[in-house]
Regions:
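Residue-level signal for inorganic ion chemistry
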Residues: 13, 78, 135
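Residue-level signal for well-ordered alpha-helical positions
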Residues: 21, 87-88, 145
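Glycine-rich loop/turn
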Residues: 56-63, 111-126
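Residues that recognize and position ribonucleotide moieties
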Residues: 74-75, 103, 132
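A C-terminal functional module that forms or caps the active site or interfaces directly
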Residues: 86-119
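Hydrophobic helical membrane-anchoring modules
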Residues: 115, 120, 128-161
Length: 161
């Protein structure tokens, strides 16, 4: 299609985004031979087991590759994307608006656009460790990691004066 959206995403490596304190949800991305994202599967309850394997799901547990690309919701989108997002959000509200725990997930919208041929998406690989506080117990290690980045000069001590 001539009016396809050109998108990009920060593609983190799954093993660099796991929490030591519980399971996480990630958009696991499949990439084709031309380095295009062809699928984003929102995957729940991902955790590393005692045997070192990375597993996902509850009753229908499956092993997932710790080297998979995952979305951490850092996207590059043109301004036209926001009109598409608004249309999809209105559809979402009509279907799930009365369900308080429902979530409008960006990776699901982008996956639909890719599969319908309305968008191309390039993964921009990051091999850095993701620092996030999914659980209260994550806070200490995140603070330590950021302090180390500041000490090593990778990250500024102050963003603004």
């Amino acid at each position: 299609k001539k009016d396809k959206l050109d998108l990009s995403m920060a593609a983190f490596i799954l093993k660099n985004t796991l929490s030591d304190n519980g399971s996480v949800t990630r958009g696991i991305c499949s990439v084709d031979g031309e380095h295009n994202v062809v699928e984003i599967e929102e995957t729940y309850n991902i955790r590393r087991e005692a045997d070192g394997k990375v597993m996902a799901g509850e009753d229908d547990r499956k092993e997932v590759s710790e080297d998979s690309f995952v979305s951490m919701n850092m996207w590059g989108c043109p301004p036209e994307f926001f009109g598409v997002l608004e249309t999809e959000f209105v559809k979402f509200l009509k279907k799930y608006g009365d369900m308080p725990k429902s979530e409008f997930l960006l990776p699901i919208v982008i996956d639909k656009l890719i599969k319908n041929g309305d968008a191309d998406c390039k993964p921009l690989e990051s091999h850095d460790k993701w620092f996030g506080v999914t659980y209260a117990e994550d806070k200490a290690s995140v603070c330590e990691a950021i302090a180390k980045l500041i000490k090593d000069g990778v990250y500024p001590a102050k963003l603004w004066d």
